[in-house]
């Protein structure tokens, strides 16, 4: 246990080469928080007796009740290494003391935006995988997010005690299970890896994989055992590490190593990993769990484990815990792996700078980030807001990438829409205090140098969710985070007592601050809408809203799904609209955009801010567009970055550039509220074929062009086989074989389609993957548990948009009914308008 003073931590923060910023990421229920606990216990912030059941990182009451992590929390740990260990570190270091900033993030898929926020401020990730369940859908999603942010992973295979006690596996089976898990992690890494990172695959023999049991509090890496044996036998540690994994066998008779699994006489040999590493562990388990009183002391003596007075009387699992903790303490193995294999901010910012910074990669700010320079101008990224203990105020939680942040410093607070030289989304304010985040508590410090994680007090009113803080007006923003989920489920919220309305409005503001991926807005009919990524996420958000942020009783509508409007064919004729003064005409046609192009736009591969030539290159080479069209994209919509495009196909039109701004504004408006039922449009390409304009500038102002362009966009869409797209979840369900029938019946009832079903090798579990429309997903978990007797656990994650088949104008079809209901709710006429409403004859 280390007694910490804030001064000591502050001293460590200056040695940036000895700082490690890392997050713990994994599938839900694979044991992140439990592992984090054993690390925290080592750093002396939680008492040794409580670790394992304290779940220190889960700071909220609902987290402790549900047993899941909802928000990501941060904590600083202290690790000291021996000189031998420090020699093995492949990057520059300074002394033996290390500061590890650990962020425990949620595994449940509805909260993956929290994970994104945590990843942005860290350089390394501890990926936790369950031995028995293996790599799941969420493991893959989170790992993909991490690699996209250029974050280096190391792996912990957790819950080894389950394999030993529940499944009673043999040594070779266990080795094969480990090998399979490592392989499936490496497949994901090599698929999504950024070449700049180099080879970041994980190898047990290099010490980048640890094997652990979070509940029992023990863990080991191959390197630790190699250390023990190299001292005992006097062999080289590096060589020993190579031999303790993979196909290498030790022949005890000849005392020679071989890579064949039989000796000269054809007797089978035991794999080195099994013999030198698993054997002592298996023997301890067997002796203790079978209560062999005489064997235990002999084994303990061999392994040099000493029990204290009252520990000698323990037996069974309690004794096992104590012994394993002494034999292989979890914190030692994990801290050693973190310090040895994860990059320091100095190392990491060198290759992460260009993915973090929006401006040119050779300006002084990007250079300062690349060098992690504490004396440069301040560059700090706030990735999220953390509510303080007194209601209503927030800490801004972020990381200093360059410069030093001080209490009382005057800074520029730049929101996500800020552009250099403009005034919007910019505040000049001073930071009241800088604080260290320590799980449940905060500690005040005076300043914080580059490379460290920090909380700021007093700027929460000026930032919505995330943003950049600088001291120089020439600095660009840090890039906005890309979330892998989108809010597709929404509810309307109203107060039970009309006097409470102001509290609700204030509460909604706070809610959208405290969660990076919730949307709150007011609809045209005056309802307050809250949108979330899924049922659980919404439930938690509304619970927060009612209890904390607004603090008043609420009435909540049934959940509604957001749809997208699209077209399925080309307009059957050219649409034409005239301006209100009849002097200007616009002729356009609409056509669908390929799904791949839409996805590229949504994932930021094709970006409205890119150079138009580079963008045209991608569209022409990858998606087969005509180069001339690809260069003449006027804008993306809605919000300037959505998956709908205006393409200028006119020939020799006078004054065309003067109306470009008006056309763009009108298109943003038209795609934000489409013609079918006022939802966002998706995958619609509008080609402007011809424009006739009045010669006199005063007769072709915005007031003439904007309504015309909007009407003609609507007309062209209604002529092009209008349709609606619904969001679809990818469901992954793990269950025993006898529950599969129940799963299929529930999925069929809910318009789900199964895409794969496979058995996990070495376990009785099956993994079923299916697509399930979000519209049908409400109450899905409950029905599934009923149908399978509680044996199936679904994971829902937003996957794609899918066109609903059927005519939107026919109210007896499925999409027609949805459209009609939505139009009535929004107070529009129940019928979808005819194109003639927007189309003008010559």
Curated annotation (Swiss-Prot):
It comes from Candida albicans (strain SC5314 / ATCC MYA-2876) (Yeast). Belongs to the TRAFAC class translation factor GTPase superfamily. Classic translation factor GTPase family. EF-G/EF-2 subfamily. Its EC number is 3.6.5.-. GO terms for biological process: translational elongation. Residues 17-346 form the tr-type G domain. It catalyses: GTP + H2O = GDP + phosphate + H(+). Its main location: cytoplasm. Has antigenic properties. The keyword Glycosyltransferase does not apply. GTP binds at residues 26-33, 158-161, 213-215. One of its GO terms (molecular function) is ribosome binding. The modification Diphthamide is found at residue 699. It is found in: Cytoplasm. Pfam families: EFG_C, EFG_III, EFG_IV, GTP_EFTU, GTP_EFTU_D2. GO terms for cellular component: cell surface; cytosol; membrane; plasma membrane; ribonucleoprotein complex; yeast-form cell wall. This is Elongation factor 2. Keywords: Cytoplasm, Elongation factor, GTP-binding, Hydrolase, Nucleotide-binding, Protein biosynthesis. It is an enzyme of class 3 (hydrolase). Catalyzes the GTP-dependent ribosomal translocation step during translation elongation. During this step, the ribosome changes from the pre-translocational (PRE) to the post-translocational (POST) state as the newly formed A-site-bound peptidyl-tRNA and P-site-bound deacylated tRNA move to the P and E sites, respectively. Catalyzes the coordinated movement of the two tRNA molecules, the mRNA and conformational changes in the ribosome.
